[in-house]
Amino acid sequence: MWKRLIPRRRNQSPVTESASKLDVTSQSEKRVDHRATDQTQTAQQNGTAIQAGRDVVVYGGMTYSDVKDAALGVFEANFYRLSSLARQTAEQRAEEVTEKLLERLLREHPEGFAQANDPGFQHALYTVQREHARTGDVNLGGLLVDLLVDRTRHPQRDIMQIVLDESLNTAPKLTEGQLAVLSVVFLFKYTQNQGIGNHQMLGSHMDRVLQPFAAKVQKNNAWYQHLEFTGCGTIGLGEIGLESILGTTYQGLFLKGFDPSEISARGITAGSEPRLFMSCLNDPSKIQVRTNSHETLESLFDQAAILTEDRQKIKGLFDETKMSESEIQAKCIELCPYMAHLFDVWSDSPMKNFTLTSVGIAIGHANIRKIAGEFANLAIWIN
């Protein structure tokens, strides 16, 4: 389960907003393509399937070929005239990114084909085609396709559609390193994976969604000024250390533990309630509070019907046994050596002061999903 976090400054109590549960498909669940031999027909609601060796899906009266022709027609009608060789390259790139988009829609959201003749969609599509034709950047093309597929899920003019349209125009103005900055800031300041229960799980999570960006971030002040200029975020006066963020979001992973005798010594009437206490992750000779954060601790209190007096005493144990920031940093680097570079850049750059806008969140989110695959729905943060 993922949860949206609201960024906070140092010494400010953490504030969170709950998000709906998300069922993420396991990485081990691979799609198998039987289309070459399987004659079973499928069609989405409002669609018609015609047998032709493989399915030819007609959605809203348009076949895949119809949609492709319409999509390429948008590019032909709008892209400026170039010399013969340059035009050939541009057309080839536009067709490549269009094919990627249509394949993604066919696989993930075929209802999106119904927007082929919508002016707003065509404008967004042309933005993707134009930027990929101009740069030929495969990574940028993949990011723009991700954003446009998301846009097809919002045919009505709502805040999500507006943010995604703006993101399509903004992403091409950024370097790969700046995209990495948005993803790293988004991951640390705006997300919490509530399924993480031990150090191994935290390490695996970071390897999947963070490691691909770690080496790309830099301290260059001009990067952050440009991100601010493009509307992806703001450089504020307040700052927060990466150790502080991790120590709040995943506090339960960074506890030193305490002797079991502390429970009776502090007069906690609930005793060694197994729903509240467990063996310490960092020192098996001790025990710790069984939670990652103050918010989940409150839920545990409610489930176990813990008395008000006991709650304050247990919170005291939770906070008093927390590692120092230097110890948290050392533990993270022990788990993931590439974190050393991130701690260094974060502490000595505007990253610690950077707050994302809705556009920065959308681009950072899409960049993570492009690399990691399955990820939480953007609607958790923008709605």
Regions found by a protein language model. Name each.
Residues 138-149, 199, 215, 220-225, ...:
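Accessory beta->alpha helical hairpin/"wing" motif in late/C-terminal subdomains of nucleic-acid enzymes
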Residues 190, 201-218:
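Short helix-coil junctions and helix-kink-helix linkers
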Residues 230-231:
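Alpha-helix C-caps/helix-loop-beta hinges
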